[in-house]
Design a protein with these regions (language model features):
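N-terminal membrane topogenesis motif
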Residues: 1-31, 87, 91, 232-259, ...
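Membrane-proximal transmembrane or re-entrant/amphipathic helices at the cytosolic face
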Residues: 2, 481-542
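Signature of the first transmembrane helix
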Residues: 13-74, 79, 108, 112, ...
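Interfacial/gating helices of multi-pass transporter permease domains
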Residues: 40-60, 128-129, 190, 194-198, ...
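Helix-loop junctions and terminal segments of transmembrane helices
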Residues: 67-82, 303-324
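Interfacial segments at transmembrane-helix termini and the short loops linking adjacent helices
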Residues: 116-136, 334, 351-381
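Membrane-interface junctions at transmembrane-helix termini in multi-pass inner-membrane proteins
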Residues: 143-166, 379-409
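Membrane-interface helix-loop junctions in multi-pass transport and translocation proteins
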Residues: 160-161, 172-215, 401, 411-449, ...
Length: 542
């Protein structure tokens, strides 16, 4: 009885901690969206193209240098903490900090010194406007490396709060400095405006690192007392610690690098092939700026919400795997995918219906290109949400290499497809859009086949896909006519768009509940679930 209770409490704690991080991620994405609006208007599409190119390289360097660190550190620290092995917990923390200081310094320095050569090799000599932005991002790699150790440590001792607060803190500084610096430097040209935008990323990382360092230093005296009293545990050698760190990080880094390198390959092929076809450099950069800073920023908000909710449940899959309970594993994966789709499907439909008006509202851009990108590109949101969750499920059942192999296969097909679309179909920025949709679809398909092969898992369809799709279809039709009606009467896009979004949320929720897409038991799992159920009963929706 006690064991069962403890297991439930542990599972509840995992969900609570995961939810804290999920909420922080949603807030961070929303801040990111809202500060990009003035940044885009101040800097312009060409500058945002340079910004997007520099950011692609920065993200790859960040993944190589620090992406696996939080997971590795949190995993090792949680094991030593469970054994009350404070001696080796301290040695793991020391080793991790030293690791990130060295790796971050080397990668940051190489990026700064060879920014010209990197830009020329990846994007071609016509895109040298990327260099100033890339140089500003070089020290950011170092800061994020160090930051990742502290985030991993706090997660390892069982609290997500420092990580969550630091992420929000980082994004606020990023927003303020990016917009301010771009406004000051835009008169010097697009390359300098892009550099101003990336300066915010650097200052945000610095602020977040200082915050985490202060929290750690406040906690350290209490922790060091435990280390000094620990006489039961023999210190591990640093060689052994680094070996375990490396083995833990490698699969995560490889999987993430394949995901991110697809973006670099896209931008590199796009830039070089279009240059060869005779496109002007400013047009190439401008189109990419619209794609990376308008379309992707907008899609990433619901994507963060869908994947964060799903990933908050994934740790439970690992627990069920350890217990050898296949039925529980199936239930955990099914619940994760279902909640992900309940958010991703209506978000995709909503963006396809209101994509143009939202783009006009946020970016004052009513062009056919931006409208088409968001309307046509919404399947990307569905496939990437689902593929992220299924990657987590495979990692949860200890099949760490499988997502890497699947991503490599999908990437190979993706590269062939984008070259054909760019070189022979002259589809410019649409080539990246369609290729990314294909990549996401292939990842979903391959991951699902792997789950069926390893644990005999097949996704339930009716409540996961059919009912949310039906509710979303009703929502889409109603929303379309509501927007058209309000705009016809008022001729104010902002009012029509915002009211239509409110109507869309209400219609979707009502139809989903009436079709029994969510059970009362599932609603209890939501934050404030009891209160939600009470109100739903009052309105006869349950």
């Amino acid at each position: 009885m006690g064991s069962s209770s403890k297991s439930k409490n542990s599972g509840g704690d995992i969900i609570v901690q995961g939810s804290i991080l999920a909420i922080a991620q949603i807030i961070v994405r929303l801040i990111g969206l809202f500060y990009r609006i003035p940044l885009q208007r101040i800097a312009g599409d060409v500058a945002m193209g340079y910004y997007g190119y520099a950011y692609d390289i920065y993200m790859l360097l960040l993944l190589v240098s620090s992406n696996g660190v939080p997971l590795a550190v949190s995993k090792l620290v949680s094991v030593t903490r469970a054994k009350k092995d404070y001696t080796n917990e301290h040695r793991i923390m020391f080793s991790s900090v030293l690791w990130t200081l060295v790796v971050g310094s080397v990668i940051g320095s190489v990026t700064f010194i060879f920014a010209n050569q990197i830009t020329r090799a990846v994007f071609g000599p016509e895109m040298m406007g990327v260099v100033p932005a890339l140089r500003v991002l070089a020290p950011t790699v170092f800061l994020c490396c160090v930051m990742s150790t502290f985030r991993g440590y706090f997660q390892g001792i069982g609290t997500m709060m420092p990580t969550a607060i630091s992420q929000i803190f980082e994004q606020i500084f990023n927003a303020v400095v990016s917009v301010g610096a771009a406004a000051i430097l835009v008169s010097q040209g697009p390359a300098w405006a892009a550099m101003g935008g990336t300066l915010g990323t650097c200052i945000g990382a610095l602020a977040s690192t200082i915050f985490l360092l202060i929290i750690y230093m406040l906690y350290r005296p209490q922790f060091m007392k435990k280390v000094q009293k620990d006489r039961l545990h023999k210190p591990q050698s640093y060689k052994e610690i680094y070996k375990v760190l490396t083995l833990t990080m490698a699969p995560v880094v490889l999987s993430s690098v394949i995901y991110q390198i697809s973006g670099i390959i896209d931008s590199s092929l796009y830039s070089n092939i279009l240059t060869g076809l005779g496109y002007e450099p400013d047009l190439i950069s401008s189109l990419y700026g619209i794609y990376s800073s308008k379309y992707k920023m907008l899609v990433n908000v619901p994507l963060a919400m869908a994947t964060a909710l799903g990933l908050a449940v994934v740790p439970g899959i690992s627990t069920a795997m350890i217990n050898g309970n296949r039925e529980e594993i199936h239930e955990k994966i099914g619940t994760t995918v279902k909640f992900c789709m309940i958010i991703a499907i209506p978000a995709a439909v909503g963006l396809s219906v209101l994509g143009g008006p939202i783009m006009e509202l946020l970016f004052n851009d009513s062009s056919a290109l931006t409208r088409n990108l968001i309307t046509i590109g919404t399947p990307y949101l569905l496939f990437y949400s689902l593929s992220t969750v299924t990657v987590g499920a495979l990692q949860g059942i200890d099949k760490m290499k499988t997502p890497i192999v699947n991503a490599a296969i999908a990437l190979g097909i993706h590269v062939v497809f984008i070259v054909i679309l760019l070189q022979f179909c002259n589809m410019n920025i649409y080539a990246i859009l369609y290729s990314n949709i294909l990549f996401g679809f292939l990842m979903c398909l391959l991951n699902q086949l792997a789950l069926k092969h390893y644990i005999g898992y097949e996704q339930e369809a009716q409540k996961t896909f059919v009912i949310p799709a039906a509710a979303s279809a009703v929502m889409g039709v109603v929303t379309y006519f509501v927007y058209k009606g309000i705009y016809f009467v008022l001729h104010v896009n902002a009012v029509a768009t915002l009211l239509s979004i409110v109507v869309a949320v209400c219609v979707y929720a009502v139809v989903l509940l009436k079709l029994h897409g969510l059970t009362e038991e599932e609603l209890y799992a939501f934050p404030k679930g009891t209160m939600i159920i009470r109100y739903l009963r009052r309105f006869h929706l349950l």
